[in-house]
Amino acid sequence: MKLTIPKSIKSNLLGYTYFAQLYADTSSCIAESLLFDFNECEWLEGNLCAVFGGILNDLQHRGNAIAFINVSDRMRGVFSRNRFLNIVESINLPNTIQSTTIYYNRFFIEEEKDIKRYVQSELLDKRLMPEISDLAKKKILEAIFEIFVNATIHGKTSEIFTCGQFFDRHKPPYVYFTFVDFGRSIRTN
């Protein structure tokens, strides 16, 4: 099955609607070969790799083979820097404290220390993060960790997917830090 990725996917209603539809369209795929065609794709906001990665992970758990085709050099660079490309290729570029990316990762709830270390190094210790007190950092870390815990308790999920992006060239600068789980929804609970 060939799936065409649209020209631009952003963190807005259209972007999230696209991924919801992609999830629905592929929900019955079992042991298939899925080609994600990026020929038309010029931009996918890095933080949305958490959503896309969760969908791909679900597909792989159901025995599907995943491949990306026609990925532009620009998109390959984005996917390489945030380690998202590791899902389909064996590439591992270092992510440094100077990087604008918060690399893609998948966590299991029992990885509490890893989750906290990730948030600390990928978000709170980045040079692009505004100067804040140690107490503020501690409170932010606690609040973010609570999101992980709530997803597992209320969502009955075992995995959390994360990715993010600093947009330091915008005025004012901002960051998107995305958490995704595929557990039970608020409506279901």
What would you call each of these model-derived segments?
Residues 48-66, 71-82, 87:
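N-terminal accessory interaction module
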Residues 175-189:
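Glycine-rich/acidic phosphate-handling loop/turn and adjacent ATP-lid/helix
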Residues 102-131, 187-189:
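Helix-loop-beta hinge of the Bergerat
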Residues 166-177:
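Short beta-strand-loop-beta element adjacent to the nucleotide/active-site pocket used for signaling
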Residues 85-103:
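A glycine-rich helix N-cap at a beta->alpha junction
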Residues 1-24, 38-40:
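STAS-typified acidic loop motif
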Residues 30-46:
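Short, glycine-/small-residue-enriched flexible loop/hinge segments at domain edges that mediate gating
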Residues 132-165:
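Conserved ATP-binding N-box helix of the HATPase_c
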